[in-house]
């Protein structure tokens, strides 16, 4: 695998033959400050199944923003919510532009 530039991305995640839209973060989680090597975290949109332990593939579709350190956890949570909305709007635009 290859690690993209750090940041927040709109992604497509494939698992069990299905494709789901998501918002992903690639980075070291600077607000929490607990990592040295970057990791990938994906929040799937409108998804409530348990896929922990499953093999998945992630396709990076669009970069939303660079990784950022927030002043506190509350600010981080607000920005994650904003990122998810930005990703949802990006996917909606792709669908509308295709029609």
Q: Model-derived features: where do they sit?
A:
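Phosphate/ribose-recognition catalytic cores of enzymes acting on nucleotide-derived substrates
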Residues: 1-99
